[in-house]
């Protein structure tokens, strides 16, 4: 897949410190219908997550079983943004690694085009 096109976007005070091209992405799981904005390329990207304000860096060693370099994504749900490490599988599916209730889980979806 060649998803890296588009421009930049601002999320106000919820998420800061994020730069790079972006596209829109649609989940195909229990988060069906939510909008996800993807950032990054094959470069390391950093971002500040809303809530605990944890600053983290996504590197090739920090995300398991990936076929493409990991990126950072911002998931926007009802006006609240959260930042998660992500990567693209060879099938073109995007995997979002999320940490909720003390456990990691993955959300998979498909590209939905450039905004």
Language model: regions and residue ranges:
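Extracellular receptor-binding modules and their adjoining Ser/Thr/Gly/Asp/Asn-rich linkers
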Residues: 1-52, 112
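Extracellular jelly-roll beta-sandwich "head" domains, especially the C-terminal globular C1q domain
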Residues: 16-20, 43-57, 63-115
